[in-house]
Amino acid sequence: MGIFDWKHWIVILVVVVLVFGTKKLKNLGTDVGESIKGFRKAMNDDEKPADPTVTPAQPVPPVQPQATAQANPPHTIDVQAQKVEEPIRKDV
């Protein structure tokens, strides 16, 4: 039997129709139907390949490492931190 009997569902349906009205329920049903149709169309579009004429990428041969360490030696910057004074506030 369950929690709701068929009589309970009839009462709930009557209350919903009285509260929202048949016109709003019809519009709501139409909107939900269009949303489901759009969702199904989008799902079908995703399953199709985007561009069947695209060829697979050719494998790139591995690049031999050059002597880049000699061409670009690391630069070391040697500085000391200096204390900066707070600016004087004009509103005080």
UniProtKB/Swiss-Prot annotation:
The chain crosses the membrane at residues 1-21. Residues 83-92 have a biased composition (Basic and acidic residues). InterPro entries: TatA/B/E (IPR003369), TatA/E (IPR006312). The keyword Transmembrane helix applies. The keyword Membrane applies. It is a single-pass membrane protein. GO terms for cellular component: TAT protein transport complex. Its main location: membrane. GO terms for biological process: protein transport by the Tat complex. Residues 43-92 are annotated as: Disordered. Keywords: Cell inner membrane, Cell membrane, Membrane, Protein transport, Translocation, Transmembrane, Transmembrane helix, Transport. It holds the Pfam family TatA_B_E. Residues 65-74 have a biased composition (Low complexity). It is found in: Cell inner membrane. GO terms for molecular function: protein transmembrane transporter activity. The Tat system comprises two distinct complexes: a TatABC complex, containing multiple copies of TatA, TatB and TatC subunits, and a separate TatA complex, containing only TatA subunits. Substrates initially bind to the TatABC complex, which probably triggers association of the separate TatA complex to form the active translocon. PANTHER family: SEC-INDEPENDENT PROTEIN TRANSLOCASE PROTEIN TATA (PTHR42982:SF1). Part of the twin-arginine translocation (Tat) system that transports large folded proteins containing a characteristic twin-arginine motif in their signal peptide across membranes. TatA could form the protein-conducting channel of the Tat system. Belongs to the TatA/E family. This is Sec-independent protein translocase protein TatA. The lineage of its organism: Bacteria, Pseudomonadati, Pseudomonadota, Gammaproteobacteria, Pseudomonadales.
